UniProtKB/Swiss-Prot annotation:
Its EC number is 7.1.1.2. The chain crosses the membrane at residues 4-24, 29-49, 59-79, 88-110, 114-136, 144-164, 182-202, 221-241, 252-272, 282-304, 309-331, 345-365, 390-410, 432-452. The lineage of its organism: Eukaryota, Metazoa, Chordata, Cephalochordata, Leptocardii. PANTHER family: NADH-UBIQUINONE OXIDOREDUCTASE CHAIN 4 (PTHR43507:SF20). InterPro entries: NADH4_N (IPR000260), NADH_Q_OxRdtase_chainM/4 (IPR010227), NADH_UbQ_OxRdtase (IPR003918), ND/Mrp_TM (IPR001750). It comes from the Eukaryota. This is NADH-ubiquinone oxidoreductase chain 4. It catalyses: a ubiquinone + NADH + 5 H(+)(in) = a ubiquinol + NAD(+) + 4 H(+)(out). GO terms for cellular component: mitochondrial membrane; respiratory chain complex I. GO terms for biological process: aerobic respiration; ATP synthesis coupled electron transport; electron transport coupled proton transport.
Length: 452
């Protein structure tokens, strides 16, 4: 596992020093080669106790690690078309940012020490900020970058203070130890727990601290949107799972407020999605609603909640990343993301419309999509916590189905505008990109045991 992280360091160096014509090829081939160790990890029954010092892998981290590694070559594949006009130095920086970001994510998911996890967690800020502010499409990208940086830093500071306090009290930040009873169920545990998970709630994000996400998604280039929706949001869910597993029931005493916000966020985000006219904005707000269910599953503190959140995070990473790719595919040809101006795509690109159809169905958790299994298991855990939660979850499910059908219907059906009838055809690169999102999403339906 140490070699896997070092591989990304070597790939960053390779992208910097290679000749001009080989920058993208080195990045793509290197990222594909680094996928090979990930396939080996999937077939190994690894526990937290049989991995090397400072690095770990278990059922919590393995799926997200493989997801991060899988998405890197797809991000490079999606970005190559609109980056060819950039100067060589900017192309090197762009590819280097994506590789470095993936390496930091892999390190965060494999860290066995909370301090190492925090360093990797914060290391994702700078490359993501560069992707948004340098390669965003509109002038509003600077405001989006400011929101992203402000929310991330403000949320992360209490986490650092809590980690320092934990080391002072316990003398250890290891993830494989249990720290129940340190506070002796005093009122301090409530402050500690809120301080610890605030950074993760902002990263997910939870309804109420989600303002940075739609702005970042809308203004980011396609690679930024893919990594944000695919992996970065899951970093928050992973951190919550790790901290709650370490502290057990002691840390769950003050979770009711966040659970209530999560349930309310599912409903509110569904309503907001139905009012959107921008493709990327709708997909971004839908991510907040799905991650609210992840928050609910984790904060219940039971195995069903953890498993449901885990499956839902991986499923959402593939589905939302593909939806952003499909939205970008249309934006590159029409220079618009407006739903009212995107009608009739099924008449222009019929094969790609099948990708839209499948991903919309998966986004609404239609059987037998993998999203359905994650949502059902998380809902069972939430119902066990409070039977009244079924009201919010049922309403959220109806709204999710409504905005998924709204997204597909508004973009695919209707009469095509005359000025969009002579667009250049879909390339093999874009077909491959869509297929590489669909294949694992369908494969996991038959092999759910890989994530449990």
């Amino acid at each position: 596992m140490n070699h896997l992280v070092l591989g990304y360091v070597g790939l960053v160096i390779g992208v910097i020093v290679t000749k001009k014509s080989m920058v993208w090829r080195v990045g793509q081939v290197g990222s594909v080669l680094l996928m090979l160790p990930a396939t080996v990890l999937v077939n190994m029954n690894m526990t937290i106790s049989n991995v090397s010092y400072m690095m770990t892998s278990d059922f919590v981290s393995l799926g997200l690690t493989v997801l991060s590694i899988w998405l890197l070559p797809l991000m490079l594949l999606a970005s190559q078309q609109h980056m060819v006009s950039e100067s060589l130095i900017y192309q090197r920086v762009f590819v280097g940012c994506q590789v470095f970001l993936t390496g930091a994510l892999v390190l965060a998911f494999m860290a066995s020490d909370l301090l190492l996890f925090y360093i990797a967690f914060e290391s994702t800020l700078l490359p993501t900020l560069m992707l948004i502010t340098r390669w965003g499409a509109q002038k509003e990208r600077y405001q989006a970058g400011t929101y992203f940086m402000f929310f991330t830093l403000v949320g992360s500071l209490p986490l650092l203070i809590c980690l320092i306090g934990q080391y002072q009290m316990v003398g250890s930040l290891a993830l494989d130890l249990s720290y129940e009873g340190v506070f002796q169920l005093s009122y301090l545990v409530n402050f500690w727990w809120v301080g610890c998970i605030l950074a993760f709630l902002v990263k997910l994000p939870l309804y109420g601290v989600h303002l940075w996400l739609p702005k970042a998604h809308v203004e980011a280039p396609i690679a930024g949107s893919m990594v944000l929706a695919g992996v970065l949001l899951k970093l928050g869910g992973y951190g919550m799972m790790r901290v709650s597993l370490m502290w057990g029931a002691t840390a769950m005493l003050s979770s009711e407020v966040f659970l209530a916000l999560a349930l309310w966020g599912i409903v509110v985000m569904g309503g907001i999605c139905l009012r959107q006219t921008d493709l990327k904005s709708l997909i971004a707000y839908s991510s907040v609603g799905h991650m609210a269910l992840v928050v609910g599953g984790v904060l219940t503190g039971v195995a069903w909640g953890y498993n449901g959140a885990m499956v839902l995070m991986i499923a959402h990473g593939l589905v939302s990343s593909c939806l952003f790719c499909l939205a970008n595919l249309w934006y590159e040809r029409s220079s618009t993301r407006n739903l009212s101006g995107s009608r009739g795509l099924i008449m222009i690109f019929p094969l790609i419309s099948s990708g839209w159809f499948l991903m919309s169905l998966m986004n609404m958790a239609l059987p037998p999509a993998i999203n359905l299994f994650g949502e059902l298991v998380a809902m069972v855990a939430l119902y066990n916590w409070s039977p009244y939660s079924i009201v919010y979850m049922s309403l959220g499910a109806v709204l999710t189905a409504a905005y998924s059908l709204y997204l597909f219907g508004m973009s695919q059906w209707g009469n095509t505008m005359k000025n969009y009838k002579n667009l250049y055809t879909i390339t093999s690169r874009e077909y491959l990109l869509t297929t590489l999102h669909l294949v694992p999403a369908i494969y996991l339906i038959f092999y759910l045991g890989l994530m449990f």
